[in-house]
Amino acid sequence: MHRSIFHSDKLCPLLAGMICVCCLLSGCHMQARTEIFASKEGYLITIGEDPTDKDTRWAKYLYEHLKKRANDDEMVAFGVSEKEMWRVIIRIDPTLQEGFRIAIKGSEIELTAADDRQMLWLQYQLIKKISKEDPRIDGSDLPPAIINLTDTCGTFAFDYQSIYSPSGLNPDYTGVMGLNNFDDSWGIWGHNLRKVLGDNVDKVYATIHGKTDDSQLCFSSEEMYRQIESYIVDNIGEKGSSRFVIAPDDTPYACTCASCTAMGNTEKNATPAVTELLLRLSQRFPKHSFFTISYLSTKQVTDKQLPSNAGIIVSAIDFPLRRIDGKNAQEKKFMQQLNQWKKVTKNIYIWDYINNFDDYLTPFPILKIAQQRLRFFKQNGASGIFFNGSGYSYSSFDAMRTFVLSALLINPELPVEELVRDYFNQEYPLSKKWLYDYYINLENSVQSGKKLGIYAGIAELEQSFLNPEKFIKFYDEMGDYVSDAKGKERKKLHELQTALSYTRLEMGRNHSYDPYGYAQRNGKQIQPTPQARKWLTQLKEHHAFTGMEYYNESADEIDYYIKEWEQYILASDIKKNLFLGIMPSSTPPTDKDGLKRLTDSTHGLPGNYHCGWTTLPKEEYEISLPVKGINKTGNIYIRFLNLPRHRFYPPRQIEISKDGAIYKTINLETDDSVEKGELVKII
């Protein structure tokens, strides 16, 4: 297990329990700092003996940025000073055994790092620690520090670490949190090779089943190589050290032209041709790094050794998000996959997931599971992590989660609950305990072994971790905290309240007229409660907040969701339904909650398959509805979802039976090229 990340002789609670292992493995000398920072006149930033240009550049960086945060310019000096100051010595040492080191001797603090990324992070750790003791330095905008300023040394757990979330993509804070800047790290990313090929993409289409197919690319094509080569030379250059992903399109088929087949391609295995291109590019550009993705047509491991500047990104899409216990079959299968890749490369990056991509707004308690997975990845040879989140779209608790995840990427042994508490204590002075208690309860709810779904609706979330009673209590209490909070805390709480109004609406819709629902039942009719309209009004405030335009990966707009609520659920004040409360049955059997939804008198929303629809995945179903005692005349309405982009379609035919005899057959016709939303049939 990777446990020796960093250590100190005077450990804060974040490092408790690590000291024995850390001391044994690193051998750093321990010395505590006895004076507080405010006891001296200021800070002298300098360099050691035989300085390099990098030493000087980083010393000037710290001088300039510490000076900006000081309430007196003269309390921060560079090079020499006659004042009684703390002396901070900056050194870059590529031969350093650890990634970073802090050495304390009297009033001298020496910061040494092996590379620029760790030096930047280390300097902001210093600034934050100084600001906590010295009121003359402002570090209020910085996240909590995760190390103590005593003699300390350590190494980042992973060579590459990035988080694709609003906070993780903020260029002002990626380096502060020790993250790689995602936008600057990759010359080509993911399945974006077509953007590089541009207008010439038609020249490199794949051959599938003997025909040219524009859904996939040919990786043995000389034109493909030349286009990528020109792109790198013209846009990136040959002297830098960028990373590039060379991957097929997101389809399961591979090119089987004569050239690709000669390299070893088969119908669903593109690894041979992709590997040859990877080897060729890595030789052509030895200072850059080239990766492909272990996913779909490139999931099969190559039999060729990859050079030091080539590697693999392994998708964890088939490794469910649940507590790791060493017993799960999918866990063992993923371990075997990593072990196979370890035989051909040391550069193994993991593409993992930290959001529910069908719902960015409902809290997603990923932190403790992510910690376990990071330990697992490290033990099994991973050298880099890409956490795929909500991108630039708002996600509830994102700033806190990004802080905790960035700390765990540096050291997976840090205690999650302490990190969460430190963040809330700093950012939410009024509501810190209330937020902490609720969020940690969510985290603990999934430690029983339940799976976190990354494409889940509200019903699945409730089954996994989202207790309706606790959530509703939390949501209802939020208004008082928003009213009582001040400044930035009030704005952030208001933002969270607005986002969670989506969750409250979804929970209300899912529960219909039960105690957690949006409506009340009176006999054979239901009526929306006044509170439901308040939730919708609160959600309409999303325009006030950056990034809160969409609620999922498919870029479904919050405004459209609101419009559908108003059009389909709240349009009529009272809804009468003679089938209300009658429980259907099905052959073959299907989800009982789904069947109950058929007669709950709550309209499904056509824009989202999670919103009120019953999924029937088999070719043929028989739905039985007991109607004994109903002697009134009227129309029966059946609504079907038609959402081709998500592969949801209405049936081709409906047979209506009464007392065992078919008395009506309805044939349905839909245009798959048109997004119809729903198809209503009156019987």
Task: Please report, for each region that a protein language model flagged, where it lies by residue.
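Feature activates predominantly on carbohydrate-active enzymes
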Residues: I36-T46, W58-Y61, H65, A70, ...
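Short, well-ordered secondary-structure micro-motifs within conserved domains or adaptor modules
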Residues: L66, E74-E98
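C-terminal non-catalytic alpha-helical accessory regions
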Residues: G139-P143, V416-I569
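Structured mid-domain segments that build the active-site/substrate or prosthetic-cofactor binding neighborhood
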Residues: E223-M224, K332-K433, D437
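Substrate-binding cleft/loops of secretory-pathway carbohydrate-active enzymes
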Residues: Y295-D318, L361-K368, Y394-R401
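Disordered, acidic Ser/Thr/Pro-rich linker "stalks" and the adjacent N-terminal cap
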Residues: E564-T633, R639-P650, E669-K676
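Short, surface-exposed beta-strand/strand-loop-strand elements in extracellular ectodomains
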Residues: H646-A661
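Extracellular carbohydrate recognition and processing domains
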Residues: I662-I682
